[in-house]
């Protein structure tokens, strides 16, 4: 662990807030993984010059509704997201019906994992 990220008791200290999100636009890059960083939770900076940090290449090739969590036993970070893409034809395929999408659309979640919030695994579907 880098000393600047650890407090005097050897615990990780807070450096910034990480916002994991997608963009609500029906284009292939809109339904991907974006990061925002903030020191105070009010003023945010885009990561990766506003481009997606991670891409969904499997399943519906788009993701929404993220959650990020950290496992206590191994310290790894995980991003979970709904496997859903409106940009790749979900609206046409399911007649613009959220009911049809929810009943007949993908039943998967996309998952990425990281030891450090910088380097991420390949997407996998669960």
Where do the model's predicted regions map?
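Carbohydrate-active catalytic/glycan-binding domains of CAZyme proteins
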Residues: 1-126
């Amino acid at each position: 662990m880098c000393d600047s990220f650890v407090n005097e008791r050897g615990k990780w200290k807070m450096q910034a807030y990480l916002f994991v999100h997608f963009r609500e636009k029906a284009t292939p890059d809109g339904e991907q993984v974006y990061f925002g960083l903030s020191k105070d939770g009010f003023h945010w900076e885009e990561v990766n010059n506003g481009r997606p940090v991670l891409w969904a290449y499997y399943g519906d090739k788009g993701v929404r509704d993220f959650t990020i969590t950290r496992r206590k036993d191994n310290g790894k970070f995980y991003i979970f997201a709904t496997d859903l893409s409106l940009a790749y034809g979900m609206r046409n395929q399911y007649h613009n019906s959220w009911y049809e999408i929810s009943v007949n659309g993908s039943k998967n979640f996309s998952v990425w994992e990281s030891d450090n919030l910088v380097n991420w695994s390949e997407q996998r579907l669960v």
